[in-house]
Regions:
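Active-site neighborhoods and metal-handling regions in enzymes and metal-associated proteins
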Residues: 1-252
Length: 252
């Protein structure tokens, strides 16, 4: 069937240049923030819109949606439309990258690496974590990027356990600074890169040990990768984390 885009009201011109869009319609929102006590009336309009699509294009009474709130699901069910989770469908489709997508991904990664390089060159004792973190944001916007999903940057004792957010903590000489870019860069593609620096590159013995372990893991796993390898096989053969680091391991 056709690709129909629901755009902001009176903003159809924003997407009129997209050649993959067959039709543009005004979006209908039924959330309370936008509509107050009229939200239920807007929801009925949206339900009627879906029913119109179902009569014209649906081959079954099922619709796959990735995110939808409770009242909409309930009303669709009442009107004979079964809602199924679209996540598995969308994620499997996203596994296959077109040549254009690969170019966009490389562009986003390039911008992230420029930002990382600037962060490393400007890192100095006395600046706050937030000051350092702002460099990545500025670089991303400067090169046509969009936004950053998280604030995962920490220094010194705050780096372990992981996942602490950037703060106004002052970075000290010799501390380790770690971060995840979590950056939605140019063309809306994500560049999620993890990096760790030591302020002024003066490693103590513990930092040298951690660096060596990290390099061992990267080198070991890199040598495993080959064309046609399944993720399951890679996981089974991949480097095993030493037991002493297991309690504070990354959750993924």
């Amino acid at each position: 069937g056709p690709v129909i885009l629901y755009e902001y009201f009176n903003c159809e011109n924003l997407s009129s240049h997209l050649n993959l869009i067959d039709e543009i319609r005004p979006a209908i929102t039924w959330d309370y923030f936008s509509n107050g006590d009229q939200a239920s009336l807007e929801l009925k309009k949206w339900i009627n819109e879906v029913l119109d699509l179902s009569k014209k294009y649906f081959k079954s009474k099922k619709i796959a949606i990735d995110v939808l709130n409770g009242p909409a699901v309930t009303d669709l069910n009442k009107n004979g439309i079964e809602v199924v989770d679209a996540k598995s469908i969308l994620e499997q489709a996203r596994v296959i990258k077109s040549p254009d997508e690969i170019i966009c991904m490389k562009a986003a990664i390039d911008v992230a690496e420029i930002g990382i390089s600037k962060m490393r060159s400007e890192l100095r004792p006395g600046m706050t974590e937030d000051e350092l973190w702002s460099i990545l944001h500025k670089t991303n916007i400067e090169y046509g990027g969009e936004w950053i999903e998280c604030r995962i940057l920490s220094s010194g004792q705050r780096t372990n356990p992981w996942m602490q957010e950037s703060s106004n903590k002052v970075i000290q000489y010799g501390e380790m600074v770690g971060f995840d870019t979590d950056m939605v860069g140019p063309y809306g593609y994500c560049a999620d890169i993890s990096r760790s620096f030591v302020v002024d590159n003066k490693f103590n013995e513990e930092q040298k040990k951690l660096y060596s372990i990290a390099m061992e893991q990267i080198d070991y796993n890199s040598k495993l990768i080959k064309n046609g390898m399944a993720f399951e096989e890679f996981v089974e053969k991949s480097w095993v984390l030493p037991q002493e680091y297991y309690p504070n391991r990354y959750s993924v």
